[in-house]
Amino acid sequence: MEFKLEDFFPLYPESLSNNSKTRFEIGSLDVINTLKEFTDNRLDAIEILPTKPGEATKHQIVIRRLLSGYTQFDALLLVHEMGTGKTCSAIQAIEQNLIESNNGLFLRTVQTTEGIDDFNFNKNCNNNYGPGLDGAVILTRGKTLMNNFMDELVNRCSTNYSSGNRNEISKTSKKLFSKFYSFYTFEIFAKTVKKMRSSEIVKKFDNKIIVIDEAHNLRLSDVKVNDEKIDVYGEVHRFIHLLTNKKVLLLTGTPMKDGPQEIASLMNLILPLTQQMPTNKNFLKEYFPSTEAPQETYELGDEEEFLKSGGEEMKNIKKFKAQVYGCVSFLKAMDSKVLKVMVGERMGSLKHYKVVPEYMSTFQSKAYVSAYLQDKRERGIYNNSRQASRFVFPDGTYGAEGFKNYIIEKRGRGGKIFRLSPSLRKEIEKRSSFKSVHTLTDEQKEFLYLQNINEYSAEYAYIIKSILNATRNGELSIVYNDSVRGSGLIVLTLLLELFGFVRNNGTAKMKKSYGIFSNETTSVREIRALQKIFNSDENMNGNIMPVIFGSRVIAEGLTFKNVIHEHVVPHWNGSETEQVIARGWRLGSHEALIKKWEQNGQVGKKPQLNVYRHVVIPSSLLSSEVSRREDDLSLVTSSSRGIMENREIKSIDLIMYEVSEKKDIAISKVLRCLKEVAIDCQLFKKRNEKDSSFDYKRECEYEKCLYVCDDNGNNLTKKNIVNYETIYFREDVFLMFAMLENHYKTRFVSTLDEITEMFFNNKVLTHSVTKQEIIQLLYQVVSNNIPIKNVYGYPCYLYENYNVYYLVDHIIPFPSSEDIFLAYYSKHPQLYVKTDSQESGKASGTNYYQSVTWFNNVLNDYYESLIPLAIKDLTTLSNSTNLVSKTQMISKQLISLPNDVQQRIIEMAVAARVLEIYCNVQNTLPPLPAQLSKEWIERNQKSVFCKKKTFRTIILDHYKNYYRIDGVDSFKMAIVWFLSDIVEERAKERCLYGSSLNLKSGYTARPLWNEWKICGKKERVRVEKERSLIKKQYETDLGYYGLWNPKNNEFCIRDIRNQTGKKDKRSIPSGKRCVNWTKPALTELAAIAINIPIPNQSVLPTLKEAMEEIKSNKELRNIVPKDNNDNNLLIKLVFWYKLSRNDICINLREWFDRNNLLVEDNSCGVQTKRK
């Protein structure tokens, strides 16, 4: 084979010079779609997420390889939705660089489903410095996000820094990661680098990965830090562009919040200074020329022009894509299995958003109109109107003024304490037609309080009533409000306390409590504690904390589980609103509720998330035609009721949503460009592309969901493996080596075909292994004399002879073809050899075999010593009077014994069965055959297997598939093959021959169970036939049968439909773990092939529900028979598909067992399988 020099070096697209107009040549990155290290990790719509700390998802592997020290990708904007694991993506990239730099000298931990031990493969490699960077600088918006990042680093995304305590970050962990990771908040970092000279910055921070978490929070504006104005964005921008050797990773799920122009400031952080994008108004003129999108603090009147314009149309798309080419990764989250319902109706100019309207009382409307007109006169921001729409205090004030008059604020031991003033409390508790509030029932008091609250806030009355109803129904709620003081969250939570709720600071599990998440009221430690309480399974039905209230703190970095109701007080930015909603709606967020619902037989409504976007509308003050009942607190509203006839007075909430929707459409145009031009577009397309039911909705950027990647790889069909074999084979080699070592735990000699088959059938590696990779691994192990621990735990070395790989217990300087016989001594180690000089008084020339103490003999003696103890324990269990209980206890105890001990117990039980005609508990011996001595019979009668027939019967029944006896009365032979069924190795079948009963002189004291010998070739052939007969019992027309391994309680399914006539063992399918079958395959097996009866018909979906599910699910559509006319089959398919794989497997195992199609098999669930 001819090699070229480039075959030994990794090849990636080269970046262009900084004088070029683009970072990479357009089209050059299409090669990414052909590289094995990336294509092996192409995403599907659904991925089973790893459960062990440190294990990476497929997209995280892609990101860490893109940012490897071997590539020229030195900056990426990660536009990854909430719930995709952006933090772990960053940590994986950092750890990859640390390993490549060899600065960390990490031990690689190898974990597989077989429980393989750690092995530091690096110790056999050269520790030269590699291309990776040697540290990381992490910038976050605040301490909460910083702590979240640290927690992910220690407890989830890596195993290199954990101290074992998952509840907090220990000093030990901080000491470990502080060697490589530096953490700063935006403001502190900007203040730090502002004081440093350029040369100092380069010296301290060069050769590092820079990660900016929630990067969209870096704004083009000054920020006050200790009364000092600092241009945070400018300092970070200067810092990044000073460094010469760095990689930059910007993390964000929402790169734009206030308008599409914000993408420019983000991209300029990572684009060279000569390729900077225009910002603010200049960006809008270039790409959205029809309007200037308003900022969050725009003045009154601006919204009219914006709403009338066509500002959501984007121009010069090709130019924009060229500027960001090679710098963007785009990923959407996997869809949650829980339905998200937008409650309400469309109002005003809204085309997509649904809102829930509430109508102000005359009192609140009067104050709101005053606030609105004041905002209009002052040409300021809408702060007064927004405060008045939330809550108006009894004296007509709102916001800061009303808060000062009616809210009592004190500083307590645990922080600030707030409570309602007596005057405000009195107004809420004032009686109506009732004599005294103290004589009211709880229902009457609730109605009275809500009626009075509605006078001051229609929105808060609605929210509180919803919370009360949800709490009674065992449902969790979240309330988001960006205003904390004034008429904001503090007032709302204090009003809720009138209904028996108490504030929880995270220190105790108080019933009917609430948590408040804001920087003004709650510390970072309290926020973490409150989140843990709220997300606990104990709280899934609100038994402790049924509701939490949050400001902007909850919009980023936090996840909330089992939420049923989310209330959103209006905000200018659709992106921020969506961030809040995503906190309680992501894959797995409702897992506990769904599981409970399924366990209860799917009775009642399936859990779903209800989202309420609240809009408060002022009542008419100018027309006597508009009337409304002041005591109407119904949660059912109508958009035609109570609308202001004075067109100058508008609902600020509705305006905010109208502006938000229009901005969101413009932002989505940019997001669509980023998705299509992303460097990983083709790799992530199956995940990012939704089905047509989402056409023209926000999920598909308000366009058709079907899209085409700019780099689609259509012209590149050949998979390129050069980079993978040069670099990334090193990553998988650790895991592959562990699998190889595990393979040799059950053998000392193995062929290349057997090793290849083992890797091809693996369920551990994330990609399919090639034969070249296997040979490369074997070559490295053999040529570098890398030790492999054998079954005894001794280090051995692997050698090869004509594709046969064998273990020897020492290094062979010059291997030869005859060395293969040395494997015998690895399998049978010598512990001690006696020399002639030590044999004083004995003749020299002693037989070598007799002079050696063999390891196997010592091991067998040890197992023999265990047998009496094991039998004693088993016979104790057999004293139970209940036969079923006795059998179950003995079977459970047998499984826990070493395999060799189990083999000996079977042999003793079989021998006792052979002697049954001679066993007599009453010591009344039957007539003896002439050749048997009385002493021999008495010795055998002492066996517990003879004395206790029931015990022996249980033993033999338990192992019924592992022995055979040819005739008892005229005994010929018995065979036991328990060990050979576990380890596919010769000389494991053991035979008891009829000749053993023909005793010779001198053997009269030897029990029959000591007469077992290794079977000959003829008997081994007989064993193979017996195995085939056992399997044939289960090979019915169905084409499947179940396997159960009692040792590890694994359940496998064997598919024998295409087995007929196959002689080559490699082509015979072995049993596959049930949980490793795909969901569609299990569904088809349960619903079509087997058609398992469903006992509880009430849990089945309706035909309409089934049709809708199949229509929206491609996997289900693919398993529906083409000629199907059976509606019941469609219902069954959906029913089984909705269950977890584990639940389907439980049902399948029970069915196989009931129908006598479940066979015990010790190879189920292990890598080494007999066929």
Swiss-Prot record:
Tell me the domain of life. Viruses
Which residues are recorded as binding ATP?
H80, E81, M82, G83, T84, G85, K86, T87
Coiled-coil ranges per UniProt: none
Protein EC? 3.6.4.-
- Write out the residue ranges of the motif DEAH box: 213-216
Q: Which family does it belong to?
A: Belongs to the IIV-6 022L family. SNF2/RAD54 helicase subfamily.
Quote the PANTHER family the UniProt record gives. Answer: SNF2/RAD54 HELICASE FAMILY (PTHR10799)
What is the recorded name of this protein?
Putative helicase 022L
**Taxonomic lineage from the root:** Viruses, Varidnaviria, Bamfordvirae, Nucleocytoviricota, Megaviricetes
